[in-house]
């Protein structure tokens, strides 16, 4: 049985531990470590691409960057990031970037939480 402190941590976790467990079961600790490492490098690049596209008023570039980040976020169970990306992607797909800067701000804040959580998960239990 989980202790209450661990349950509280799980409730506020920025990633879904079930998604990480599925990856661990599918490919072992090495696959999970590799996917986390790739995400921790690629996510900031995707966020920067989204920001650049947004600054250039490039709707298609914004949509593409957010779509890419959405997919990788879902794979690692970062569902708040996934939903924020989805909202921004949908707005861009509809031809509007209204509200997208605020979504990207939120994404950057959420990524900071996810990055810390995934780095800890990678270091603790991915063998």
Residue spans for each PLM region:
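Two-component system phosphorelay core
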Residues: 1-64, 68-127
């Amino acid at each position: 049985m989980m202790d209450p402190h661990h349950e509280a941590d799980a409730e506020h976790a920025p990633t879904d531990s079930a998604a990480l467990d599925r990856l661990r079961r599918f490919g072992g600790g090495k696959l999970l470590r590799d996917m986390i490492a790739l995400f921790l490098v690629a996510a900031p690049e995707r966020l920067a691409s989204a920001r650049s596209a947004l600054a250039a008023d490039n709707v298609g570039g914004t949509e593409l960057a957010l779509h890419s980040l959405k997919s990788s976020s879902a794979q690692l169970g970062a569902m708040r990031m996934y939903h924020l990306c989805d909202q921004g992607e949908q707005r861009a797909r509809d031809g509007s970037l209204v509200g997208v800067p605020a979504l990207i701000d939120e994404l950057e804040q959420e990524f900071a939480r996810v990055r810390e959580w995934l780095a800890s998960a990678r270091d603790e239990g991915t063998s």
